[in-house]
Amino acid sequence: MERIQENDPIIKSADESKESPAETLSSIFKRPKIKSSSLNKAYLGKAGSVNGASNTSTNQISSLKVDVSSPPSTAPGSAGSTPKTTPVSLNAGVPPSNTGANITTNSNNNAQTISSSSQSVGHIDNPSGLGTHGKVRLSIKLSTGGSGGSSVTGKRTAPGNPWAIRSAERLASNPTSIGTSSPESIDNNSNNKKSAPSLYAAAAASAARHSMSAAYASFTGTVYDSNGNVIKGLDTSSSLSSSSHPSHEALSTIDTKNLQALAASAAPSSCRQQPVDEERQDRVSKISKHFQDSGTPVSEEVSPTRLPSPTSARRASHLSEGKWDEIDDEDDDDWGSTIEFEDGTTVVIDAKTRRYEPVKRQDTLASNHVPSAPSNESVSSAAPSKIPVPEEASINEHSNITDEAVSLPEPVYPNAPTSAVSVHNPTISDEAEPTERAFLKKEKPQISKEKKNPNVTHEEFVEKSTALPRHINKVEIVSDSSESFAHKNNEKRFDKEASGRINDLRAEQQQIMLEARQKAIERRRNEEEELARSRERARKKAEEIKISSSKMNSSPTITNERSSNVESSKKVEAIYTKEPQSITNSPEGLHSNQETTEIDPSSPRDDSTPLSWRSHSHPIPPVQVSPLFTSDKNDPLQLNPQSDDSTSSPKHGKSRSIDEVILSIKDVIFDNNLYKQRSYQSGVAANAHLPHRVPNEHGGVSRIGNSNALGQPVSSSSSYSHSKGRDTRSSSYVVSSETSSLKSSRLILSHANSVRIQRSKGDVILNLHLPKVNPERFLPTKSLKLEEMKPLEEKVPIYRSSSKQPLRIHPTHPLRVTVCLPGSKTIQVARRSFRNSMNANRYDPQRRERIDSGLWRAKN
């Protein structure tokens, strides 16, 4: 076992320990607030728990550096700071079982001879060093290197600060760290962890780390629980003290499983020294056995009530160490069974190792309960019935010992080790519940078997459950348990019966679902048929419109144009929708699609129907973008395809309304831009840069009048988007009779050579072909040449603000750059939109600098 470093915390005089509020060990011991380890060390160690400590080498003890001497001794480990240790007078008549061996603790300043009994008391000799002295004045100074008084005792903070205790333990958990529970001492401990071994003398000093105490115990032969409590000195000082590491002997005596469990539990507990834990475990097991064998209470002076509740102390320590998972997962016995009172002896089960013969007994009980509890069937019922009994027994068993013992049963021992060794551990001998223990032993295999076979058939389960209650009755556990088993069995049978009903219900449910599905299919089929009928009606209506439009084409009316547009759009739609519609799954849909193909030119857009939208992902057919064309009213395909007029497909008003809403929004934007464009293009001068067009023959018809552009197709480079405007929009234009023949042409040239985009209902297709010429536009903010627009296009991120980069063109200029593309519309980037647009995520600081500085404007 690694020896505690010389700079171990020194148990200081009580005067020094005053630094912490309930510094006196008595106050500490009074309540579990004090780390149970230190208290238990002091108290439990009193009764020969120090046995075998007497022979511990002085070095070991000195490493503990228990300065029993009440005068504050500054341990070098304490960095010369004399921690004030609460003078703890342990009124534990510590039988000098190992008194013969007085250990001189070399607190670097004070070499105190600590009688092994004093050591047992908490490794703290009476200041007088009388091992036999019933009262031990524990003045623990944990020399945490710097933790002067704070290291007084891990327990020093224990009175009210379990966290501090735990943290002190954690610090002390490093063998070098001094386990002072006080936060200050914790900090100091952390600083001095390596300098000062954790002296869980806290039992005596109420601050010794459990591992420290374990190490010290291994030296002194005193066994300390994880809390540093003296579990028990070995019966003979020689047993522990015979070797500086009596733990080896203890190990031999200790159950291997116990050692393993102790080591396992100790390891999870914050960095507890495995060797220390093992030795402590050995000692603990030895001591526990010794207690059970001797049946002698550790010290009559130590009233269990005064002992810190190991449960609370451990809980606090676990809390501070984040050990709750360990507690809950590994064993709640850690709390409940911490103090094992066998034969009236007070045994503190190491919270860390949690492997103690008495604990094991409870663990076995718990384990028996636990396996049964997991099985939710009759076994589970048995488990609850059994669990209360062992708990009660344990409570009764220990209730005489301490109230804390009663509180201990709180853990259900869910994870208590169920090892047969622990079950049969002789130390378990507990007169209070031999029958229960025997029953558990007998029952355990059965319970585990049932637990293993939770999936057995109901009959088997019923049999097992019935057998289990029978066995319980034999064992005479509790009639209630047997009754509960019978009740459980009845429930199981009922469940079995109910299972059939449940299956019936399930089948019925499935049947209902199938029927509902069929009904849904039928309903869908009916809907599709209705859609097909409505499509047919729309088709007929479209044919009528087609006929009427063909008749009206001769008349120069916007209506004719609209009808021709509708016709062309229908034709295009038929072309586009024929293929996707054929994909529709419903036979009606296929039929309608076939019909659509038959009536291609006049077929209404199937896309407008919800079914078609479901059938294919492109409800709106692709739009043909044709270069500006000579107005040929008879060539409808030159027109941009248009969605049906609401009149053409009245049955699809809803879907059309969706399209129209979108298009109307686009149209509104587009129209506003056109108006602005017209206002900006206030004359031929402004438009002189536009691609050359034949002057409008009817230039005087109206400012925006349609001009005759026959034979003058605009070059595709300057072909402007042909977007379909709303009918109301087209009516806003003054149409000369001369240009009525041009109505089929969507793009109408104004007398000013500006292009007016007349749009009937339909998608707004905006193809902006920037002319190769460099027109100037007089914008509200700035006159911007088109050549400048290239940089602007490159600087799109400037004009498109992303959520990440708000737009800032220039502090003086609001973001209002209106670019009038020649002849088509003004592109007005007037909106600080934060939607992610092109290159939205791209940010060029230099570019932004240029922009902000207005360098790009300088180009103008």
Curated annotation (Swiss-Prot):
Residues 51-63, 96-121, 173-192, 364-383, 416-428, 552-567, 579-600, 627-650, 704-714 have a biased composition (Polar residues). The modification Phosphoserine is found at S69, S70, S81, S303, S309, S555, S603, S649, S655, S657. This is Uncharacterized protein C1604.12. It comes from Schizosaccharomyces pombe (strain 972 / ATCC 24843). Residues 275-285, 434-463, 485-507, 516-546 have a biased composition (Basic and acidic residues). GO terms for cellular component: cytosol. Its main location: cytoplasm. Residues 326-339 have a biased composition (Acidic residues). Keywords: Cytoplasm, Phosphoprotein. Residues 1-31, 46-192, 265-339, 357-464, 481-656, 691-735 are annotated as: Disordered. The modification Phosphothreonine is found at T597. The keyword Cell membrane does not apply. Residues 69-83 have a biased composition (Low complexity). It is found in: Cytoplasm.
